[in-house]
Amino acid sequence: VAQREKGSALKFFIDTANLEEIAEAKSWGCLAGVTTNPSLYAKTGGALADFEPHMQKIAELCKGLPVSAETTATTVDGMVADGRRLAALAPNIVIKLPICEAGLAACRILADEGIRVNMTLIFSATQALLAANAGARYISPFVGRYDDIALDGISQLADMITCIKNYDWSGKNPDGVVEIITASVRTANHVVQAALLGADIATVPMKALKKCLHHPLTDAGIAAFEADWERVANA
């Protein structure tokens, strides 16, 4: 099991492009960042022309917190151009790139310019190591998608964490640190397992985030306290 640095803690990001969900999660006082992707933006019903203004709204809503915005280009030049443009929208925007030849090349160019990159769609430890060496500030392994094909995503996550935490990444990216974002989270247990392994971050959709928050015994206890207090108040 990977050993965490003293004083570090699992951080919660929300995986959505929905402004209301982001505002609600932020109101809880424990939100540390946001991740988005083209599919999540499509779910908002927004138009293509509104994509960048929408990312800007998220960044403004979450000032000081990293907000990952993904490029849709498929070439190095396109990814770099998209990345530069998105990064210019707000200082807290992180550029999300897919792990592929073009993604690695674009990552190195953007990282050398001081732009933070979140390398996504990571499914193996070798991909994670390549991304970190190309300058990725964040690495996003997708645990839930392993479950979809009856494989163990948590064991793959464990390998990635061990490999990344074995090394000092000083000078490789703008911050000299590589953080692992556990992504494609479907259940509260995914979050627990990520925390046990020492992942830095879990990015969680609102549905799963509420599963992390609520428990039937907690809900029953709150209802009982409220009922008892109402009897006291009405006595």
Please state what every model-predicted region is:
Residues 10-14, 18-22, 28-31, 36-109, ...:
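Active-site beta->alpha loop and helix N-cap motifs at the rims of alpha/beta catalytic domains
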Residues 20-28, 78-82, 106, 124-134, ...:
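Catalytic cores of alpha/beta
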Residues 52-67, 104-117, 153-176, 180, ...:
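Alpha-helix-loop-beta-strand connector modules within alpha/beta enzyme cores
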Residues 15-18, 72-77, 97-101, 119-126, ...:
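Glycine-rich beta-to-alpha transition loops that act as phosphate-gripper elements at the mouths
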